[in-house]
Amino acid sequence: MHRTFYEYLMTLRNPNDHSEIAEFAKNAFLDQSFPKQEKDYHRLSDYLELNGNYLPSMAVFDETYRAYEASESTGGDSYQ
């Protein structure tokens, strides 16, 4: 994996999209403490469990992280 999860997440920001994942991306952008250099699922999950009160459910993170892993394994931006 070359880019960080945060870098991937920022590709999902869209002010016209009100999906849970787009909202997650927007709120992570506003979260000045978000671990921007992190790639590890468990470290990110631990951070969000303690600080991600903007996430309606950890399932949103899980879905986004799976898409991140898929995009990194194919070398592109894939989100379904």
From Swiss-Prot:
High-level lineage: Bacteria, Bacillati, Bacillota, Bacilli, Lactobacillales
Family: Belongs to the UPF0346 family.
Protein name: UPF0346 protein LSEI_1394
InterPro entries hit by this protein: UPF0346, YozE_SAM-like, YozE_SAM-like_sf
Record-linked HAMAP family: UPF0346
NCBIfam families documented for this protein: PRK13672.1 (NF010193)
Residue runs in coiled coils: none
Species name: Lacticaseibacillus paracasei (strain ATCC 334 / BCRC 17002 / CCUG 31169 / CIP 107868 / KCTC 3260 / NRRL B-441)
